[in-house]
């Protein structure tokens, strides 16, 4: 499975592509950071991120895009910019019919380090080790993008099993409710 991991941000948006195979084997394909200057107007910044995402999607052909889920941050404008950057990448994927999954920072940290409270240095060290890289990806946004891709490769089988279980439960509930309605109808005759 080829995954494009995205650490969204207006100033720095990390992009990382990883190939995952059976088990926990992952292989790095590409990593970079899209930068936009703060003095550039918002529309131009989002367009630059969107253009880069579209280029990466065309070039690397991911099967899924994994984006860091924005959570409450102290700085509202930072959270808004992060959400907007993630949104344009999600839209680029959706236009091509590529599934988009969101993972929280703690899910990503737990997947690659074993602790949802790991710091950026620990995440970078583990990404470097897991992918057998000669040098650590820099800046941290690049390492985070790779961590998102790794996290998705490792969590995807569980996510699929949960989705199948939920679908089966919904189907069982539908059948049960239909049978109840049938029994109720028969009882009122």
From Swiss-Prot:
Co-factor: note:
Binds 2 Mg(2+) ion per subunit.
List the GO biological process terms.
DNA recombination; DNA repair
Q: Which cofactor does it need?
A: Mg(2+)
Indicate which residues the UniProt annotation says bind Mg(2+) 1.
7, 141
Task: List residues binding Mg(2+) 2.
Answer: 68
Q: InterPro entries annotated for this entry?
A: RNaseH-like_sf, RNaseH_sf, X-over_junc_endoDNase_Mg_BS, X-over_junc_endoDNase_RuvC
Note the CDD domains from the entry: RuvC
Q: Which GO terms describe its cellular component?
A: cytoplasm; Holliday junction resolvase complex
Active site residues of this protein: 7, 68, 141
The record's principal subcellular location, in a coarse class, is cytoplasm
Q: Please state where this protein is localized.
A: Cytoplasm
The protein's enzyme class: hydrolase
Q: Where are the transmembrane segments?
A: none
The catalytic activity, as recorded, is: Endonucleolytic cleavage at a junction such as a reciprocal single-stranded crossover between two homologous DNA duplexes (Holliday junction)
The EC number(s) attached to this protein equal 3.1.21.10
Q: Recite the UniProt keywords alphabetically.
A: Cytoplasm, DNA damage, DNA recombination, DNA repair, DNA-binding, Endonuclease, Hydrolase, Magnesium, Metal-binding, Nuclease
Source species, domain of life: Bacteria
Q: Name one Pfam family in it.
A: RuvC
The similarity comment for this entry is: Belongs to the RuvC family.
Its subunit composition reads: Homodimer which binds Holliday junction (HJ) DNA. The HJ becomes 2-fold symmetrical on binding to RuvC with unstacked arms; it has a different conformation from HJ DNA in complex with RuvA. In the full resolvosome a probable DNA-RuvA(4)-RuvB(12)-RuvC(2) complex forms which resolves the HJ.
Task of the protein: The RuvA-RuvB-RuvC complex processes Holliday junction (HJ) DNA during genetic recombination and DNA repair. Endonuclease that resolves HJ intermediates. Cleaves cruciform DNA by making single-stranded nicks across the HJ at symmetrical positions within the homologous arms, yielding a 5'-phosphate and a 3'-hydroxyl group; requires a central core of homology in the junction. The consensus cleavage sequence is 5'-(A/T)TT(C/G)-3'. Cleavage occurs on the 3'-side of the TT dinucleotide at the point of strand exchange.
Q: What is the protein named?
A: Crossover junction endodeoxyribonuclease RuvC
């Amino acid at each position: 499975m080829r995954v494009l991991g995205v650490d969204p941000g207006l100033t720095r948006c990390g992009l990382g592509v990883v190939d995952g195979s059976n088990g926990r084997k992952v292989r790095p394909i590409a990593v970079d950071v899209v930068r936009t200057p703060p003095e550039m107007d918002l529309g131009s910044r989002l367009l630059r991120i969107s253009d880069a995402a579209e280029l990466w999607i065309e070039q690397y052909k991911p099967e899924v895009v994994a984006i860091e889920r924005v959570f409450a941050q102290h700085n509202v404008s930072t959270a808004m910019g992060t959400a907007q950057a993630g949104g344009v990448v999600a839209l680029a994927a959706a236009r091509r019919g590529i599934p988009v999954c969101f993972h929280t920072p703690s899910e990503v940290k737990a997947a690659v380090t074993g602790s949802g409270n790991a710091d950026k240095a620990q995440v970078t060290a583990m990404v470097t080790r897991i992918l057998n890289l000669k040098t650590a990806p820099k800046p941290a946004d690049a390492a985070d993008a790779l961590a998102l891709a790794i996290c998705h490769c490792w969590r995807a089988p569980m996510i699929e099993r949960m989705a199948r279980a939920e679908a089966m439960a919904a189907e069982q509930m539908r059948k049960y409710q239909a049978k109840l309605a049938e029994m109720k109808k028969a009882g009122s005759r």
